[in-house]
Amino acid sequence: MPSATPFRLDPDHLRFMTDGVSINTASSGAQDLPSQCRAFGCRVDDAGRRIRVFLSGAQAADLLRDVGQSRALAVVFSDPPTHRTIQIKGRDARVERLAPGDPAVVAAYRTAFVACLRPLGFTEPMVRALLDCPDADLVAVGFTPEAAFNQTPGAQAGTPLQAGAK
C-alpha cells in the first residue's frame, strides 16, 4: 500500500543535487537491459516533490525509449572531489517539454561543473565538450522521487536516505 506521506528530500540534498555535481541517469526497457546517459543539470520543483533532469535527446535516445516503456528512472548525483554520492529513484518518469527557464539552468550547471572539475586538473574546454548539447536537442525528464540512497563509497553505501531528514 502506498505511503500517505510523499517522500521528500531534505534541503541539504536538494542543494547538493543542483550545485554542479556530476549527474548520470539510468533506466531499463522491456527486457531489463539498462540504458544510461549523462545529464546536463537538474531542476527541483515544488520543494523536491518533482525533479527534472536535462538530457541530450540524441545521446539519450535509448534511455528516453526505456523511460517511455517502464517509467522507471534512477539518477545519481556525485561530487567528484569528495565522491559524495546520492541516488534518487522514481517510477513515474516522463519526457516533458522544456520550460522557459530550463536552458538557463543548463547553462548555469555547465559553469558550475567546470568550477567543480577545474581544481582536479580538467580544463574548461574539456568539461564543456563533455557537456556539449545544442539547446534545440535538450529534453527534460521529470519524475517524483520515491526513494533515495547514500551511494558514497564506504560502509554506508546503499543505505536509504530518510525522507525529510539528513
Q: What are these language model-derived features?
A:
Residues 1-23:
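Short, basic/aromatic recognition patches
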Residues 2, 87, 93-166:
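C-terminal edge-of-domain segments
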Residues 13-14, 64, 128-133:
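A generic local secondary-structure boundary/capping motif
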Residues 18-56, 86-87:
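Short beta-strand segments
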Residues 20-23, 70-73, 138:
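Short, surface-exposed beta-edge/turn micro-motifs
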Residues 27, 55, 77-79, 144-147:
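Short, structured patches in soluble enzyme cores that scaffold and shape functional sites
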Residues 52-54, 74, 89, 140-142:
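Beta-strand secondary-structure signal
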Residues 59-109:
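Short, structured beta-strand-loop surface elements
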